[in-house]
């Protein structure tokens, strides 16, 4: 294995959202938002990142509301308007959640642009998003292909210390830990990141050219 990329990736799962608590019917909420507890989790993560002096120089975020909210709260230090620590934000549909339930389907772009006018959603203007088809289909094989493209996306960015705000099931695809028998709509808790959990990985390229996330020795 070799690593000429010299990139560090901080994988962050979003804070607790409406579909993470309550009855199964909550999975029918379209693109749910954070709960009050989820907001508190994000505030705690903001303090943790600051106390550990995490040197983020780029942010990649899923275009779903719970991840956008998590980014705005947990990474507020890095998003400071005009501040010395302000870093670029990349909104990418590659990092949306897998699954076909309403809770895993994003809002239409016109609504997103109204809710979050300061961000660029151009990458979502692909004629597919937010529909769950083609590269975004709720399918294990397709999601594995999407995770490969997501890693290629990260590798192509000019930044070296990248925070990625994404979702529990898709994180398992990024880490190549999803098995075909797994239910991607209802992932067992023992197989997932906790809400607002973050872990540090090195983005490396193997001798065969494969991109992988390997847990960092500095974690």
From Swiss-Prot:
- Coiled-coil ranges per UniProt: none
The record, for InterPro entries, names: His_Pase_superF_clade-1 (IPR013078), His_PPase_superfam (IPR029033), PG/BPGM_mutase_AS (IPR001345), PGM_Phosphatase (IPR050275)
Its GO CC terms? cytoplasm; cytosol; nucleus
Keywords tagged on the record: Hydrolase
User: One GO molecular function term?
Assistant: phosphatase activity
Q: What EC numbers are recorded for this enzyme?
A: 3.1.3.-
Pfam families reported for this sequence: His_Phos_1
**Which cysteine pairs make disulfide bonds?**
none
- Is Hydrolase one of the keywords UniProt gives this record? yes
Top-level enzyme category = hydrolase
Catalytic positions are 14 (tele-phosphohistidine intermediate), 167
Q: Which family, according to the similarity comment?
A: Belongs to the phosphoglycerate mutase family. BPG-dependent PGAM subfamily.
Its protein name is Probable phosphatase SPAC5H10.03
Source species of the chain: Schizosaccharomyces pombe (strain 972 / ATCC 24843)
């Amino acid at each position: 294995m070799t690593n000429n990329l010299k990139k560090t990736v901080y994988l962050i799962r979003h804070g607790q959202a409406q579909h993470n608590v309550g009855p199964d019917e909550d999975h029918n909420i379209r693109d749910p938002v954070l709960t009050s507890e989820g907001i508190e989790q994000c505030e705690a993560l903001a303090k943790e990142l600051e106390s550990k002096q995490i040197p983020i120089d780029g942010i990649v975020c899923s275009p779903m509301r719970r991840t956008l909210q998590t980014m705005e709260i947990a990474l507020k230090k890095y998003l400071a308007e005009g501040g010395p620590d302000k870093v670029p934000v990349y909104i990418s549909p590659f990092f949306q959640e897998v699954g076909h339930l309403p809770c895993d389907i994003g809002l239409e772009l016109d609504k997103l642009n109204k809710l979050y006018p300061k961000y660029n959603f151009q990458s979502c203007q692909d004629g597919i998003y937010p529909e769950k088809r083609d590269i975004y289909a709720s399918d294990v094989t397709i999601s594995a292909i999407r995770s490969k493209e997501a890693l290629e996306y990260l590798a192509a960015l000019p930044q070296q210390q990248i925070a990625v705000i994404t979702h529990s099931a898709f994180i398992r695809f990024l880490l190549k830990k999803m098995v075909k028998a797994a239910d991607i709509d209802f992932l067992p808790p023992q197989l997932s990141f906790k809400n607002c959990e973050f872990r540090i990985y090195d983005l490396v390229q193997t001798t065969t050219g494969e991109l992988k996330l390997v847990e960092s020795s500095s974690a």
